[in-house]
Structure formats: C-alpha cells, structure tokens
A protein has these predicted regions:
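Aromatic-lined carbohydrate-binding/catalytic grooves of carbohydrate-active enzymes
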Residues: 3-141, 150, 155
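Active-site neighborhood of glycoside hydrolase catalytic domains
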Residues: 64-71, 81, 103-234
Length: 234
C-alpha cells in the first residue's frame, strides 16, 4: 500500500498552450502549494502534425520541438531539482487521422471498411485495433519508449477519450468481426501485463473522459481513477 501523491495537472490551466518556461513555473508554484507531483497533460507531442488542438498529432508520440526544445527529459530533471516528481499524459490507444501514424498504418484502426471515418465527434480521434498483435506492440512501445528515454518519470495518466463505434477490424477474419469488443479488451490486457511487468512501481492513473472505465478489470492494472472531467484549474 502506498499513499497517492498530491498532484497538480497542467491541463485546466493551459490546455495545449504552453512552453517549457510555463511548465516549469507551474511546477514551482505547485511545489510551493504543497504538491508532490506535477503532471504534463495533452499537447506535448507531434511535429509534422503538431498537437496544438485535438484535430491532429495523436499517435505521434515524439516531443514537440517547438514547445519543448530541450525535451521531456529536461523537464523531468528540472522538476526533480525543484523537489517535485514528474508525471506525463498518454492516450496510446488512440490516433488522429491527421497524424503520421495514421498515414503509415490506416489499417490499424477500428473501422468498418467502406464507411466514412468515424473520427468527428469524439475529439476527432480513432481507436487503434488492439486485437492486432502489431498494434499491441506499438502501444506498449509508446509507454516503454517514453519511460526509457525520460528517466525519472514517476507517474502516467493513461487516458481514453472515446467509446467504440463503427466497430470493425482489418486484422480479424470475416467470421470473427463480432469478436472485436472482447478481442480488443484481451489485447489491452496483454499490453498492460507487459507494462506492469516492466514498470511495477510506476503510478498509473486511469482516465476515460473521467470515470468511463471504472471497472475491476482496469483497476487491477491502474488502482487510481480520475473520477470526473468536470474540473477546473484550481
């Protein structure tokens, strides 16, 4: 058993509009308020398709060089030097149509062939098909690369901001299309097993538009839930 850290999340304060100086100033203020952890939320990634709004960049998990020219690692080091731990936001199950990931792997999404892309409506994002072992490897790789390239990250906010619609799989055979829901869950659990095996001591908080995944299966892997998105900056 460990007590959960008191944290400050930058999302409500600046959303997509930030730079390194802004974040470090917020981290210092959070420390002065008594917070133990500073969490960088959405907007830190994407270069060809910068994550400056929710239209683009999701799936391209490399640090945005314009906002953070010295990288995530420098933020971790400076926050740690100020006496506050550092956490980061990921939504590795999702992708925007405006992303290099989708451009390179359009067959990795959940989608009924022959229908229009169903990315309008839930933050303009699509769901990656976790029934596909290649997608499972990619999603694990997002987490693993983020952690190994930025030593000192103590916390992950794992988000999931849309539900499954237009459900179809380019990976599953025709006679297994109705299995996409359960095969997706099994694929996700395989990824989380790998994450927990390699990073057993990392805090992982689950968010899904708030408490949209508040269930025992996910609590097994992520014992902390973001109960509601109905929040403010302070």
């Amino acid at each position: 058993y460990r007590s959960r850290p008191i944290l400050y999340n930058d999302w409500e304060g600046c959303m997509f509009d930030f730079n390194q100086r802004t974040l470090l100033r917020l981290a210092k203020s959070a420390k002065n308020l008594g917070c133990e952890l500073f969490v960088l939320d959405d907007g830190w990634f994407g270069n060809k398709h910068p994550r400056n709004n929710d239209d683009a960049g999701l799936g391209d998990w490399e640090t945005n060089h314009t906002k953070l020219p010295e990288g995530i690692g420098q933020l971790v080091r400076e926050a740690t030097a100020q006496g506050i731990r550092f956490g980061i936001w990921l939504e590795p199950e999702m992708v925007n149509a405006r992303s290099e990931l989708y451009e390179n792997h359009p067959d990795w999404i959940i989608h009924q062939p022959g229908r229009e892309l169903d990315d309008t409506r839930n933050r303009k994002q699509l769901i990656l098909d976790l029934s596909n072992p290649k997608v499972q490897d990619f999603v694990f790789g997002v987490v693993d690369r983020t952690m190994t390239e930025n030593p000192g990250i103590a916390y992950i906010k794992w988000d999931c901001n849309r539900f499954m619609t237009n459900a179809g799989s380019y990976y599953l055979p025709k006679d297994k299309q109705s299995h996409i829901f359960i095969e997706y869950a099994r694929g996700l659990y395989k990824v989380l097993d790998r994450v927990r095996e390699k990073y057993p001591d990392t805090y992982i908080m689950l968010c899904s538009g708030g408490g949209g995944r508040f269930d025992p299966g996910m609590l097994y892997y992520m014992p902390q839930i973001w109960a509601s998105d109905d929040t403010d900056a302070a």
